[in-house]
Amino acid sequence: MRLRLIAVGSRMPKWVEEGWHEYAKRLPSELALELVEIPLNTRGKNADVARLIRQEGEAMLSKVQPGERIVTLEVHGKPWSTEQLAGELDRWRLDARTVNLMVGGPEGLAPEVCARSEQRWSLSPLTLPHPLVRILIGEQIYRAWTVLSGHPYHK
């Protein structure tokens, strides 16, 4: 099974890359966790933000192949407990399609991305910094895998 985090934003601090890779490498080879970065469009004082978000959304969707699952991370998505995420991970594994977890830029996801989403997931009702979200997703996917595999990491 292949899980991809498609996220707007690049050139993250080293601690973000290290945190992401720490959890990605802990997963078994049959559960590949990949990161695809979409460059954040420059937002100037007079920028047409709606157009920039639409362009970022198009770039995100261009990374998704037909038939792949899209799961958007949204403030108004469904909150999952660790056990619920483990259940979703197991269903995704049985479905055998690539799963694309979509994280938008500072203003969120393009409506076109949300419209293609099969599931909407909320990490928290809090506003979280995007660099931290990457690590949090990696850790939670790893934790969900440990629940499914009986690993003692999740106690």
From Swiss-Prot:
EC number: 2.1.1.177
Keyword field contains S-adenosyl-L-methionine: yes
CC terms in the record's Gene Ontology section: cytoplasm
Chain residues that bind S-adenosyl-L-methionine: 73, 104, 123-128
GO function term, MF aspect, one: rRNA (pseudouridine-N3-)-methyltransferase activity
Keyword vocabulary terms for this entry: Cytoplasm, Methyltransferase, rRNA processing, S-adenosyl-L-methionine, Transferase
Disulfide bonds: none
UniProt function note: Specifically methylates the pseudouridine at position 1915 (m3Psi1915) in 23S rRNA.
Xref: PANTHER family: METHYLTRANSFERASE, RIBOSOMAL RNA LARGE SUBUNIT METHYLTRANSFERASE H
Subunit structure: Homodimer.
Protein name from the UniProt record: Ribosomal RNA large subunit methyltransferase H
